[in-house]
Design a protein with these regions (language model features):
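C-terminal recognition in membrane/secretory proteostasis and scaffolding
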Residues: 1, 326, 335-447
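Short beta-strand elements that form the blades of beta-propeller/WD-repeat-like
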Residues: 6-8, 22, 29
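N-terminal hydrophobic or amphipathic helices/low-complexity stretches enriched
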Residues: 31-93, 99-101, 106, 147
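His/Asp/Glu-rich mid-to-C-terminal helical/loop segments that flank catalytic regions of hydrolases
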Residues: 32-33, 303-349
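Second-shell loop/turn segments in exported
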Residues: 50-59, 75-91, 120-124, 164-174, ...
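A non-catalytic alpha/beta surface segment that caps or lines the substrate-entry region
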Residues: 79-139
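Alpha-helical metal-binding/catalytic segments enriched in His/Glu/Asp
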Residues: 136, 152-210, 327
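Metal-dependent peptidase/peptidase-like ectodomains
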Residues: 193, 203-302, 313-320
Length: 447
């Protein structure tokens, strides 16, 4: 009746309107400009508002960094299992002592009175080497589930020294995983009582063929009794998340894994990606091969993998804090679940590690994209000064064949590379956008 006014005033009993009008509001955030009227007015934006306070992260970057910096100290000689020590160096034994001390500090129970699981392992070169896993326990409350523990694990060994005698730091691989393992175990010990036990393990000998996890699965500590492992989560290279989705390998081994990962993403905001393959060079495979549902949590490959440049300063500690929160949620889900998982191990394919291993001398130097599901192998980058770098391979190239042999997936790519030697010349067919490109590369030693 009156139209739109900013103010109206009335007098008398009738009442009678005596004043009305519209305030000028050229930049009010309440103004709406009808786009059909073609107005040229520019409204001021809303001022930035700072929150009164912010919650600190559940897992502090400084605590995670403290573990990483200790485990990457040069005196540990790259945490190699066969390094000869000088009087001033601790080697991998120093890393083991540090982890034992942390297990004791945070209140993990020592199984059978000791955190050490020590045995004699025969290496590929025939040498017999004493190795030690570090094992701690968070007891469960239900006696009926006492022999069905969840295992949370991360390997603490690395590559030792390079040919110049310089230690490989192994910050992402795998000081990052051990740091998360310790911090999450500390939180669970303080604030969570699971119905089934949770076993915390730092494995040795992963880089030499999963020696620690194979021994743990085949010969678990006797104090655990007649154990049947319920499930296993493996932390390996979780320090370079950098805003990406967390990769979870092996999710096909139990029906519940994808739903658990999805639920955790909704709860804490750390999203997961479930690649349809498993990296065969990490410790969860020892459990898969023994019928235990197991997943590998992974932040993604990078060009510092197995290089001197994999240092503590390169890690994403904010992302590492998110990984720790993810693991805590997963451990609580499994630890308070009394029903068995619906095991689907037949659906969990295993592929060989694609970026090179001690057994394969020749290397192309590509960084594969595990999230790619199409034909061939898409690469996310190349190792500097590698064969791939020399011939101009680049991000998003898709490798379709090697010497005329079709590369259907990461499995075949890995298998084909293992048939070549250093110095072999390989014709590589690429899909580069809309173009098919062929280049010829001379394979080199791993760098």
């Amino acid at each position: 009746h009156y139209g739109k006014y900013s103010y109206l005033s009335f007098v008398g009993d009738a009442p009678t309107n005596d004043v009305k009008g519209v305030w000028a509001s050229s930049d009010s955030p309440l103004v709406w400009l009808n786009p059909e009227r073609g107005s040229t007015r520019v409204l001021a934006g809303l001022p930035a508002v700072t929150a009164l306070t912010e919650l600190p992260p559940k897992y502090l970057a400084a605590n995670l960094a403290r573990h990483v910096e200790k485990l990457t100290d040069a005196g540990l000689l790259g945490r190699g299992i066969t390094q000869v020590l000088s009087p001033r160096d601790e080697g991998i034994e120093g890393a083991a002592r540090y982890i034992q001390g942390e297990f004791r500090r945070i209140g993990l129970q020592a199984i059978g009175g000791s955190y050490l699981q020590t045995w004699q392992a025969t290496l590929d070169n025939g040498k017999v080497q004493q190795l030690s896993n570090l094992v701690g326990l968070i007891p469960g409350s239900d006696p009926a589930l006492a022999n069905q523990p969840v295992v949370l694990g991360a390997h603490y060994d690395h590559l030792g020294l390079d040919e110049r005698g310089i230690p490989f730091p192994g910050a992402d691989d795998n000081a990052s995983g051990v740091a998360v393992l310790i911090e999450v175990a500390a939180k669970l010990t303080r604030a969570f009582t699971p119905v089934r036990p949770i076993v915390i393990v730092a494995f040795s000998g992963e880089e030499s063929g999963l020696l620690g996890s194979k021994h743990f699965v085949s010969s678990p500590p006797s104090a655990l009794g007649d154990v049947g492992f319920y499930a296993m989560i493996n932390l390996d290279a979780v320090g370079r998340l950098e805003g990406r989705k967390l990769q979870v390998f092996g999710s096909e081994s139990a029906y519940e894994w994808p739903f658990m990962a999805q639920g955790i993403g909704y709860t804490i905001g750390v999203e997961s990606q479930l690649p349809a393959q498993t990296i065969a060079s990490s410790d969860h495979v020892s459990f898969l091969n023994n019928g235990v549902p197991a997943i590998h949590v992974f932040s993604g490959l990078h060009t510092d993998y197995h290089r001197i440049s994999d240092s503590a300063t390169e890690l994403d500690y904010e992302g590492l804090s998110g990984v720790a929160s993810w693991l805590e949620e997963a451990a609580m889900y499994l630890g308070q679940r009394s029903e068995p998982l619906r095991v689907t191990l037949a659906n969990a394919p295993v592929v060989v590690a694609p970026l090179g291993s001690e057994e394969r001398g020749a290397s192309l130097g590509t960084v594969p994209d595990f999230a790619y599901f199409g034909a061939g192998v898409r690469i996310t980058g190349v190792i500097p000064d590698s064969a791939a770098d020399a011939v101009g391979l680049r991000q998003n190239d898709i490798i379709m064949s090697l010497n005329g042999q079709t590369v259907t997936d990461l499995q075949t790519y890995s298998n084909l590379l293992r048939t070549y030697a250093i110095g072999d010349v390989v014709a590589i067919e690429l899909n580069r956008g809309e173009e098919i490109v062929t280049v010829t590369a001379t394979l080199t030693a791993r760098r």
